[in-house]
Amino acid sequence: MFSPSPQTLSILVAVFILATLLIRRALLPKPIPGIVYREANAKKILGNAWELLQWKKKHGEMFGYLANLAVELNEPVFQIFVHPLGKPWVIVADNREAFDILSRRTPKEFDRSRFLRSLFMPLVPEFHFHMPTGERWKAHRKLVADTMSPAFLGGVAGPQMWKSTMKLIDLWRVKERLAKGRPFSVSTDIRKAAFEIIWAATFGFDSGSTNAQTELLETLPEFTNLGDMDHEVHFPVAPDPPVFKAGLALNDAMNIGVQSLVPGLHLWLAYNLMPSLRAARSLKEAVIQDEIKKAINKFSNQTDLNWEDQGNLKRHMKSAVDIVIAREIDSARKEGRTPELMSRTVQDELFSFMLAGNEIFTLTAWTLKFLTTHQNVQKKVRDELREQCSAAVERGDAPTVSEIMSARLPYFEAMIEESTRCGSVTQTNIRTTMQEVNILGHMVPKHTEILMLNNGPGSFMPPLTVDEEKRSESSKGTAGKIGQWNVKGMRDFDPERWLVKDEEGRLTFNPNAGPRHSFGAGPRACFGRKWAALEVKIMMALIVWHFNLEPTPKPLSSFKPFPGVAHRPEMIYLRLSNV
């Protein structure tokens, strides 16, 4: 039996200790020279990751940690360490420089984030959103470009949004009657309505989710023993159609990646190994393929499409599937090639509309909470709507899509923008450096993730001091073009901060009153922002038109966010009364 000598044992122990120290050193963060960081985090293998997770556990989101760290370090550009062996992330806490990066320095110096790519690739590998800027991205975006045209939004998507929202109104009328003035949660209702609206506009038919819930509640007798007026009312839930349920499940799975240190791998394993998600993906693909086939049959022999004639398009186009398939057939005919109609590209681009439901649901949820809390704002919004849609008032009916879209509603627009701001719908914009870049005098290496805060200094905290000489030339040229918020009241919900008077003395919505990057900016801004803006406008206009959003009890009025893909409120309760 081998028995090492004391000298050998000493050598082995020394080698083990040395190896341990070398491994630990290799795992420690490697700061980018010249960029500020918290020194204590650079001495930990997990860097800032543990503190980020603890902040998220306590507050429901993690970007507040970065905003506070910016103030602590007193630096508009600093770095954090989130992945062992990974590169540091660079944080930009200056709105003007962030806007310059998004709008003028993308895509030459900055491009779509690799982190975001890892979130979307496992489910929709051919979705243009996560692709680097280039010919492939342009081709994919061109395929769906018509879905954001005024003709499609006003003539096809808008009416579908209106119809679906009215079904939500019908559901809430039943709930309001059964609740008898008591509060109830609308989180699930809003989420399903947001997705159902997108579903109807994308595929041209109703999923039936909201109708099923309304029909179930209409069969119930009047509720008894409801408790006091502040007691929450619970309602039974109708089962969702299988394909609608599948779409929601696939969307929810994105949260797996958001909360993972290796999002791409974690999501790939989930989509491919979890039986429920595998079944959901198969059902989703089968339904999309079936709808594509219907559109192919509809347009294969259609030769009179005039893309400049809006009336012509309205006659033929009933959904996003229609317009995407018709465009591909028409383009292929002109280019002398075979159309790629059943491709993964077409399927992923169509399903991507469903992924946008997170942001729409989130913005609608925050808006409802702010209007419930700020009764004076709610009254101003309703009064403006009724004044500008006076024909609907005279008819005793809801305003039509065209009336809502054409109405001059500066206060309404300001309220939506302020809800977007105060709800921090998108707390950060992320880009990847495409070359070594200079950000406020700091040299940042190629392929570094850049996080630009929407919730920090200059937005909800006093701006940090920046040496103007260190700004990029394009940033210097924008001085004074976008306003800055008064430090006093930065955190307050105040739609009037977005309003100015025009030459005729009329109140006008000023989009440049202050920083607004929630949907990004520049060539890689959110592709679906026009769709989202219209959907939220129609939903909120019809909700406020039909209901008073009465104050809710304090225990049901928390503004704490829910951790996930989008920064949404954890609870959404309404106490409704008919207008």
What are the roles of these predicted feature ranges?
Residues 452-506:
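Conserved cytochrome P450 K-helix/beta-meander segment immediately N-terminal to the heme-binding cysteine loop
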Residues 280-363, 501-504:
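Conserved cytochrome P450 catalytic core segment spanning the I/J/K helices
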Residues 375-378, 521-525, 529-567:
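Cytochrome P450 heme-binding "Cys pocket" and the immediately downstream C-terminal segment
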Residues 37-61, 67, 116-202, 220-297, ...:
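Cytochrome P450 catalytic-domain helical core, especially the substrate-recognition surface
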Residues 381, 419, 444, 493, ...:
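Hydrophobic, well-ordered secondary-structure elements that form the walls
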